[in-house]
């Protein structure tokens, strides 16, 4: 990030108002109007870590707090486009951690219909690289892609724990696709669509992958 403490034609000595600098540092949060929303929202928007919450001794307390937060968030109707865009990006970055922490997919999907930019395009053939154990428990994640190669990457890698991974296939419609890919997801070439699995007509297993070693 470019530092603007001294302009090219400025004198060598500059009086710096530290209070003004502090205000500038927090300007983005002021612009986003975060004071009107639950405090934990800043944790998501700032990309803070979730490991200390899930791996510490107070995980039950943190889970309760985050469930309350997600429930409260679902009651808001955000109107700030910059806020929505930032949330969309950070959801794609950390949704697997948020999902593990909250441990309530229905609660999360209800919230996402309010907080992600609505998809209104045509129906799409979509794929997901899912963990076999979670699939058999009906715990299918929200992240799908129109690129089968992306699903294969996850089914044979990150999600191939336990008994292995599977590539799932479905037809997503505007009634089941909550949001399309964020700019961040497109940059990563993952093309992640956020899906409400409760609204899918069918989900089929395309292929299996052996458990990941190591």
Positions of PLM-derived features:
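Conserved NAD+-utilizing ADP-ribose enzyme module
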Residues: 1-125, 132-142, 146-214
